[in-house]
């Protein structure tokens, strides 16, 4: 008896045998019209989604073809690179160059990769966020920013010059969250058609939250203000906050972003007293910037603890930054602890 064969999806009560929702490609075509920069942006996003579809196919196979977490090198900051890090980098670079972008900045390369000389947009990307989760069944993702390529150093522009930003979350479904400056849109990959179909438009963060996302094991290394905020939250309804809080920490910024965009919350990965963490750990250009862009479009906020992320002018390609993002009200409350 064959235990498994070609899978046909389980059909639930109320399921349709056809997906009628608009595709992301069709949405982008309508948004772009005949505008050259918008067309270039749309083509770049389509290339990323094509890469995401191919990447998730490899993720789903786990260790069957080989070890995706095999160490193969280090990047410019001496972070260990896994086989799947390098493979996903090569995949997205190839597709983005074919899409006609001017240049690509990837976490896995020291310098930007040159693309089309007369390209109109530049793409900053973390090809595989959370690669420490490879092989564990925990969240992984791809996150990107698209900038106009009308300046000499497109990746050293402040985040408020982003044309578009987004992420793909590889979880129990393959979900896209993106914005072209007209609100946040969610879409899900249909493995049957190979297309991302829109599931929600104009996504907004709630006005209040009781969910926090941070690494509690480093609490003792945080600033006095941050420790006071955490302590007050953990006192729950018996403390000064007057309500109970939950904690979530997925170990991948994309995973936490996707959860917060749907359920609300406040994420913080800030600078602390540990060596190498003085300025935070996330990358400003291709992690903090796209998250901040999406948070703003959803009615939330993102700061480095004092400055809006989108106002910061990067000094280097792989500059690190502290990051706090999520529900605006809670971020404002946290800000009060920084000045106490």
Curated annotation (Swiss-Prot):
Cofactors, names only: Mg(2+)
Main location: cytoplasm
PROSITE patterns the UniProt entry points to: FBPASE (PS00124)
Subcellular location: Cytoplasm
Keywords in alphabetical order: Carbohydrate metabolism, Cytoplasm, Hydrolase, Magnesium, Metal-binding
Catalyzed chemical reaction(s): beta-D-fructose 1,6-bisphosphate + H2O = beta-D-fructose 6-phosphate + phosphate
Cofactor annotation comment: Binds 2 magnesium ions per subunit.
Signal peptide feature range: none
Pathway annotation: Carbohydrate biosynthesis; gluconeogenesis
Binding site for Mg(2+) 2: 126, 129, 287
Oligomeric and partner information: Homotetramer.
Descriptive protein name: Fructose-1,6-bisphosphatase class 1
Organism: Brucella suis biovar 1 (strain 1330)
């Amino acid at each position: 008896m064959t235990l498994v064969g070609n899978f046909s999806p389980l059909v639930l009560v109320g399921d349709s045998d056809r997906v009628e929702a608009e595709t992301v490609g069709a949405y982008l075509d309508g948004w772009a019209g005949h505008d050259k920069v918008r067309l270039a942006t749309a083509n770049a996003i389509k290339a990323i989604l094509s890469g995401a579809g191919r990447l998730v196919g490899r993720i789903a196979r786990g260790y069957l073809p080989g070890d995706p977490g095999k160490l193969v090198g280090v990047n410019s900051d001496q972070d260990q690179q896994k086989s799947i890090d390098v493979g996903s980098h090569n995949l997205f670079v190839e597709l983005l160059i074919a899409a006609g972008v001017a240049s690509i900045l990837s976490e896995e390369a020291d310098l930007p990769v040159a693309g089309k000389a007369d390209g109109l947009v530049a793409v900053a990307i973390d090809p595989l966020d959370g690669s420490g989760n490879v092989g564990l069944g925990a969240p992984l993702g791809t996150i990107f920013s698209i900038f106009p390529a009308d300046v000499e150093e497109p990746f050293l522009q402040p985040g408020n010059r982003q044309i578009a930003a987004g992420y793909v979350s590889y979880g129990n479904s393959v979900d896209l969250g993106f914005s072209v400056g007209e609100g946040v849109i969610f879409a899900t990959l249909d493995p049957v058609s190979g297309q991302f179909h829109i599931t929600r438009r104009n996504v907004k963060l709630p006005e209040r939250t009781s969910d926090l996302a941070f690494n509690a094991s480093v609490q003792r290394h945080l600033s006095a203000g941050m420790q006071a905020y955490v302590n007050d939250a953990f006192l729950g309804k018996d403390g000064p906050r007057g309500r109970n809080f939950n904690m979530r920490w997925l170990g991948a910024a994309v995973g936490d972003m996707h959860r917060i965009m749907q359920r609300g919350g406040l994420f913080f990965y800030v600078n602390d007293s540990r060596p190498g963490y003085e300025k935070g750990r996330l990358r400003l250009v291709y992690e903090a910037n796209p998250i901040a862009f999406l948070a703003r479009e959803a009615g939330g906020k993102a700061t480095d603890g004092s400055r809006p992320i989108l106002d910061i002018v990067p000094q280097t390609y792989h500059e690190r930054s502290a990051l706090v993002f999520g529900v605006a009200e809670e971020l404002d409350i946290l800000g009060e602890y920084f000045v106490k």
